[in-house]
Amino acid sequence: MDATLDLIASDGFEGVTIAAAAQGAGVTRQTVYSNFGSREELVSQAIAGLAVEVLGGIHSRSNATDTTCEYVVELIVAGRAAVRAHPVLATLLQAERGNPVFDTGMMSRAKPVARELLEPLVERDPGVKSSLDDIVEIALRLALSVVLFDDDAVHTDDDLRRFLTRWLSPAMPSSS
């Protein structure tokens, strides 16, 4: 996966091939195919792994929140900050061929990652369990929108927090 991330950083998504990833990792193409099945899956898993690693660092920030809404808001704010700060994640902002954000099936690959990041909500408030799928769906769609369509109205973290809180608060389950 590191070889794939190196290729994305140096050549963009178009530079990622099974052969190039195998060469960079020092393994055979068959090994890469056996582990990932396709170029798209290789890229998606590499980006998802990096996203989980980068966003994993925000749990202390999210754990300091009091409500489900605040947790989701902080996760989205931190996610946008990570995309802005990390060179490989920043490539997600470019509408280039091979970008996994624009691949068919992207949502089905992104939902398990989002679910993993939002699963701590159930531990904090078991009443959230019945709504978790909906929370994953709305948080993922909002996060993608925030990352892809930056705007002056929500450019700063505080502006984004206010916007997200205003619209997410009525939609989130009450904490018990």
Question: Where are the regions that the model predicts?
Answer:
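Amphipathic alpha-helical segments used for helix-helix packing
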Residues: 78-108
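HTH DNA-binding helix-turn interface
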Residues: 9-13, 30-43
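Amphipathic alpha-helical packing segments from all-alpha helical-bundle domains
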Residues: 55, 99-137
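Ser/Thr-centered, proline-biased regulatory motifs
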Residues: 13-20
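Alpha-helical structural segments
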Residues: 2-10, 24, 41-61, 74-78, ...
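Append "Primarily bacterial transcriptional regulators
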Residues: 20-23, 32
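Amphipathic C-terminal alpha-helical segment
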Residues: 81-85, 120, 137-156, 167-175
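Amphipathic alpha-helical segments that line or abut small-molecule/effector binding pockets
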Residues: 2, 66-84, 133, 137, ...
